[in-house]
């Protein structure tokens, strides 16, 4: 059974949807709104309920009532025609009676049919008469289509005109019976108006689509002409290229040229022959000028959804066009351009076939085929080695060369690359002077005199612990001085000082002469190729002998210019400032002869002089700028770390923003403290600096892991033997990185047989809680050099029983660690004979054992001594005494020529005349 919606039932019986919904709900039907559906029998019940709810009147009464209404209307009409005055007679209102809806619907339908027929004839006449001009035809069409227009005023005008015409001829047809006054909705009229509006809208859209199709056809024709012209031009160019390459033995190029010349026109023609389904289905040739179809399939355009779906339908699913858009003419196929092969090809190891094809502008399939002919099986995503790439390029006739890749993480390339500096921008720079010499020969005193400060008095034990970089000005020119330690432990720091210096001042005490560190400084300077200026210090002291110093230095290859050598000698007294001016003039003279120059326009490069950790500032590094200019906020890579220059201070502690060549500065902003002697370089941006720093740190870690010794069959015995060696674990914390290195190197050089030093951890900064935790876990001793533990670290060390040793002089640390190493060894014992006794008689006691009566013949016998039982010159037993008595008393010892009794633990086989030898094991102190 079919179903009906409530709004359709309301439309049929002339009721509102709300009334129908309420009536259906009162009948017990499960409906919610006017869109709810009911069965056909339920729909009949609803209609009958409306009919039965009102009192039915007889048919004749209805007819009589209709007759009265018609008659009254006729009378009123006649009165209106004959007399314009309003009637004074009161009109009686008809009593409300039951309505016959079926009769009313039939009457309305009949009236509408007659009206449509009459208006249709009138429309035909108007259309025939108004085809002479466009404007008049438009007006006639507007009048003829009045019944389709949703303009109720126009319908009323047509109705009034028809009424007047029929009134003149006295042939007015019977009108439908007058209905009682009320605002009823004329659904038929509204449906007719909606149909008219839809038809008009479709007509407008049809005309617009027709015009668009015509424009698209004209555009397609124009594009076809352009495509033909382009194809002819491409054929001519291909023919020229073919003639140009005819002399070259490249078969594949000929095939490609022929394909390119023959392909475009055929492809374009075949594609143009295709017609879309929408063009086939819509034949606009059958439409008239107004865009309305005269024949073919007439679809029911009254359904609004059908109209919308027809407008927005997409019949050709193969075309990726948007809905509602007509498919234009297909685009002509552009022909493939022919590209010349490059003359040179720069490749990198591991390039894929697809990358090579893109670079030389060839198809990957072509390269795969060539490789197959060469005996190499490859796909377009497969990597090729350098030899294969070169063979492939030879086959194409291209010169191939490998690309030189620059390692961005390599800082050393800036120092080795001569092209890094611009020769036109080289200017004179201040010399970098390093002061070297033996301990207490006056290096820091000389530097102190030069700077007019009292730094030297603050050195612990008279030893400079780390490099100091200072800059002074003499005769309008600047000189940079580096002060290096003289102790033997600081060999690496002296070597670093020689590597970054331009001139070496070798200071030798006139009363002390050449010492081991003096010779070492000479060797460092010669290895670096640095000129040496000898300053003979302490000439004011009694016993000073400069001539002896000159002769001793000549034995080591440092010859004075007075003796025909190359080294300048100046006799000074650093304490009293004697001949200091002459020494500075000599430095400037040697610097002028060396022609020291630098390029201040490049990005800065240089060397780390010293590095430390500051509690408030973090990592602080003392840098010596060798080339370029260092600015604040420059991204920088220092050793295996990176950062941005947050702040710069000079040797006087003042903030500076720019540091030129040969300028020492201290910077902050690094993520961790670098190693002294590391090189640094400024990068273009922070991203590049970060990448280079992280890569260098990764390489350093990998190198450290590679240096780890692994156990193998060859070194298995050595490893087991090394496990027997005892070790002293130490944790080193110092104020500067150079002191950390020197202290660690010195401790590792301590030679105590059977014991070695194991540096568990070494760093710059104060002793903190993590150091104490590490020392507890590794059973290590913490050595603090010029640093103090934090209060929290000290409390934790006391609680965990961790030993912290604090020092300020390096040789004190070495002595203390050496003592600890000696105490770590197992003690050595030496046997000491106390005395001898002879067994005179034996006594066997049950449940006790054998008691030997003895007499001491030499030395003494003690209670805690060990004894040997010797019989006939052979040791029978070696053990401990269980008891020792003199007569009946227990005694600790029995002296010479005395008698006593003894028992030996776990031994009862004593016999007369056995010799008892008493001895102890005495510890020997290591030297």
Curated annotation (Swiss-Prot):
Span list, region G1: 437-444
Q: Which domain of life is it from?
A: Bacteria
- Location of region: G4: 537-540
**Pfam families reported for this sequence:** EF-G_D2 (PF22042), GTP_EFTU (PF00009), IF-2 (PF11987), IF2_N (PF04760)
Q: Name one GO cellular component term.
A: cytosol
Q: Where is this region: G3?
A: 483-486
Return the Polar residues bias intervals: 49-69
Establish whether keyword Cytoplasm is in the entry. yes
Q: Which GO terms describe its molecular function?
A: GTP binding; GTPase activity; translation initiation factor activity
Identify the keywords attached in UniProt to this record, alphabetized: Cytoplasm, GTP-binding, Initiation factor, Nucleotide-binding, Protein biosynthesis
**Region of interest: G5:** 573-575
tr-type G domain mapped to chain residues: 428-597
Protein localization = Cytoplasm
Keyword Nucleotide-binding part of the UniProt annotation: yes
Q: Where is this region: G2?
A: 462-466
Where in the sequence does UniProt note compositional bias of the Basic and acidic residues kind?
70-86, 101-138, 160-171, 202-226, 234-257
NCBIfam families per the UniProt record, alphabetical: IF-2, small_GTP
- What PANTHER family is this protein classified in? TR-TYPE G DOMAIN-CONTAINING PROTEIN, TRANSLATION INITIATION FACTOR IF-2-RELATED
List the protein's name: Translation initiation factor IF-2
Q: Which organism is it from?
A: Streptococcus agalactiae serotype III (strain NEM316)
């Amino acid at each position: 059974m079919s179903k009906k919606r409530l709004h359709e039932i309301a439309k049929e019986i002339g009721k509102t949807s709300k009334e129908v919904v309420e009536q259906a709900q009162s009948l017990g039907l499960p409906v919610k709104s006017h869109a709810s559906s009911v069965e056909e029998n339920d729909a009949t019940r609803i209609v009958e309920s409306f009919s039965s709810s009102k009192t039915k009147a007889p048919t004749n009464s209805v007819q009589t009532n209709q007759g009265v209404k018609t008659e009254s209307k006729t009378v009123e009409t006649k009165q209106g025609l004959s007399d314009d005055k309003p009637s004074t007679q009161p009109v009686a209102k008809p009593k409300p009676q039951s309505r016959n809806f079926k009769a009313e619907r039939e009457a309305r339908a009949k009236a509408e049919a007659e009206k449509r027929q009459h208006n249709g004839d009138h429309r035909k006449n108007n259309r025939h008469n108004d085809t002479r001009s466009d404007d008049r035809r438009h007006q006639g069409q507007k009048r003829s289509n009045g019944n389709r227009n949703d303009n109720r005023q126009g319908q009323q005008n047509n109705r009034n005109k028809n009424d007047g015409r029929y009134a003149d001829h006295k042939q007015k047809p019977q009108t439908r019976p007058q209905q009682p006054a009320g605002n009823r909705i004329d659904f038929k009229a509204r449906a007719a108006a909606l149909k008219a509006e839809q038809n008009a809208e479709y007509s407008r859209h049809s005309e617009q689509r027709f015009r668009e199709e015509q424009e698209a056809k004209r555009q397609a024709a124009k594009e076809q002409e352009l495509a033909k012209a382009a194809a002819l031009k491409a054929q001519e160019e291909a023919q020229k290229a073919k003639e140009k390459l005819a002399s070259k033995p490249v078969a594949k190029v000929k095939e490609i040229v022929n394909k390119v010349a023959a392909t475009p026109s055929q492809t374009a023609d075949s594609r143009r022959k295709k017609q879309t389904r929408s063009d086939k289905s819509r034949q606009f040739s059958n439409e008239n000028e107004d865009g309305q179809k005269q024949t073919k399939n007439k679809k029911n355009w009254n359904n609004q959804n059908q109209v919308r779906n027809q407008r927005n339908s997409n019949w050709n699913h193969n075309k990726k066009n948007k809905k509602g858009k007509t498919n234009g003419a297909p685009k002509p196929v552009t022909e493939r351009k022919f590209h010349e092969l490059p003359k040179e090809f720069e490749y990198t190891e591991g390039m894929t076939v697809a990358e090579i094809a893109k670079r030389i502008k060839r198809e990957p399939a072509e390269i795969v085929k060539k490789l197959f002919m060469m005996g190499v099986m490859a796909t377009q995503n497969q990597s090729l080695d350098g030899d294969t790439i070169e063979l492939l390029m030879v086959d194409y006739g291209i010169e191939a060369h490998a690309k030189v890749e620059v390692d961005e993480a390599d800082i050393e390339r800036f120092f080795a690359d001569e092209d890094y500096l611009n020769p036109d921008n080289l200017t004179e720079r201040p010399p970098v002077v390093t002061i070297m010499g033996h301990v207490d020969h006056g290096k820091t005193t000389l530097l102190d005199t030069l700077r007019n400060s009292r730094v030297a008095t603050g050195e612990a034990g008279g030893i400079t612990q780390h490099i100091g970089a200072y800059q002074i000005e003499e005769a309008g020119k600047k000189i940079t001085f580096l002060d290096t330690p003289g102790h033997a432990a600081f060999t690496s720091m002296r070597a670093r000082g020689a590597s970054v210096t331009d001139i070496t001042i070798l200071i030798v005490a006139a009363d002390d002469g050449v010492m081991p560190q003096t010779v070492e400084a000479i060797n460092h300077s010669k290895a670096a190729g640095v000129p040496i200026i000898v300053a003979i210090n302490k000439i004011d002291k009694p016993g000073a002998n400069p001539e002896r110093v000159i002769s001793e230095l000549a034995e080591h290859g440092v010859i004075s210019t007075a003796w025909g050598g190359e080294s300048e000698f100046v006799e000074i007294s650093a304490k009293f400032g004697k001949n200091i001016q002459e020494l500075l003039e000599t430095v400037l003279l040697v610097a002028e002869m060396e022609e020291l120059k630098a390029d201040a326009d490049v990005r800065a490069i240089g060397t780390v002089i010293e590095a430390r950790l500051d509690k408030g500032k973090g990592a602080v590094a003392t840098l010596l700028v060798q080339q370029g200019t260092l600015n604040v906020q420059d991204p920088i890579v220092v050793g295996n770390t990176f950062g941005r220059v947050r702040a710069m201070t000079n040797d006087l502690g003042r903030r500076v923003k720019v540091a030129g060549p040969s300028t020492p500065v201290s910077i902050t902003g690094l993520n961790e403290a670098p190693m002294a002697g590391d090189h640094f370089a400024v990068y273009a941006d922070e991203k590049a600096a970060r990448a280079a720093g992280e890569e260098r740190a990764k390489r350093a870690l990998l190198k450290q892991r590679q240096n780890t010794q692994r156990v193998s069959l060859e070194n298995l015995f050595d490893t087991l033997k090394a496990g027997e060696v005892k070790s002293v674990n130490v944790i080193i914390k110092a104020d500067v990185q150079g002191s950390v290195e020197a202290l660690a190197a010195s401790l590792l050089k301590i030679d105590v047989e059977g014991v070695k030093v194991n540096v568990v951890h070494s760093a710059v900064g104060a002793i903190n809680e993590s150091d104490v935790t590490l020392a507890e876990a590794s059973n290590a001793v913490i050595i603090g050099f010029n640093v103090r533990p934090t209060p929290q670290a000290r409390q934790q060390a006391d609680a965990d029983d961790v030993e912290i040793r604090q020092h300020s002089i390096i040789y004190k640390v070495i002595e203390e660690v050496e003592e600890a190493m000696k105490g770590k060894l197992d003690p050595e014992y030496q046997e000491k004979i106390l005395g001898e006794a002879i067994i005179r008689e034996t006594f066997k006691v049950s449940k006790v054992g054998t008691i030997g009566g003895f007499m001491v013949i030499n030395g003494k016998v003690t209670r805690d001594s060990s004894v040997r039982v010797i019989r006939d010159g052979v040791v029978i037993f070696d053990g401990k005494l269980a008891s020792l008595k003199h007569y009946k008393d227990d005694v600790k010892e029995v002296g010479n020529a005395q008698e006593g009794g003894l028992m030996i633990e776990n031994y009862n086989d004593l016999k007369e005349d056995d010799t008892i030898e008493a001895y102890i094991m005495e510890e020997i102190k290591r030297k």
